[in-house]
């Protein structure tokens, strides 16, 4: 049995809670949406190959959302297949993860996310590039700091 923590050490550095801000912009940089986030990245004790992430979002108008993303590790890749998304994440160097996913309700749309973690493991910078029919149409910029 392979161990996700050993074979994806950059991903393992993300374990814990993160707070930050998501800023959605159009191609000209105009802000379309902005909200606060609290993400929990977990490696459940009952399996060497499991990953579990909870994303909580809060907008200034009081709107809130929570989404759960269980993942399974295989071949140095983290795979997601939930009722909402399908996708995969992999490491590209000692501080960078790439995530590709698509929403099951919008098959012509997908995104690539680049996730950078700081050397001290306390800050993350993330960028989503959104594509529809293989053409970029918006970006999400995310800045986070470790809560725990």
Where are these regions (language model features)?
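Sparse, context-dependent recognition of short Cys/His-centered cofactor- or disulfide-binding micro-motifs
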Residues: 3, 24-26, 82-84, 100-102, ...
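Amphipathic/hydrophobic helical signal segments and adjacent flexible N-terminal regions
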Residues: 1-68, 132, 136-148
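Glycine-rich, aromatic-bearing surface loops/beta-hairpins
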Residues: 103, 107-148
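Surface-exposed coil/turn segments at beta-strand junctions on protein surfaces, enriched
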Residues: 11-13, 92, 119
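Central antiparallel beta-sheet cores of small beta-barrel/beta-sandwich binding domains
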Residues: 32-112
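General beta-strand recognition
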Residues: 19, 98, 123-125
């Amino acid at each position: 049995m392979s161990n996700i923590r050993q074979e994806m050490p950059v991903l393992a550095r993300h374990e814990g809670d993160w707070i930050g801000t998501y800023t959605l912009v159009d191609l000209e940089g105009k802000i379309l949406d902005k909200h606060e986030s609290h993400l929990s990245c977990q490696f459940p004790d009952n399996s060497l190959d499991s990953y579990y992430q909870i994303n909580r979002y809060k907008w200034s108008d009081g709107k809130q959302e929570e989404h759960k993303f269980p993942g399974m590790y295989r071949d140095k890749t983290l795979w997601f297949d939930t009722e909402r998304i399908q996708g995969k994440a992999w490491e590209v160097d000692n501080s960078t993860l790439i995530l590709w996913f698509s929403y099951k309700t919008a098959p012509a749309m997908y995104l690539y996310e680049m996730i950078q973690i700081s050397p001290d493991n306390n800050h993350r910078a993330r960028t989503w590039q959104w594509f529809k029919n293989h053409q970029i149409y918006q970006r999400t910029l995310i800045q986070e700091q470790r809560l725990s």
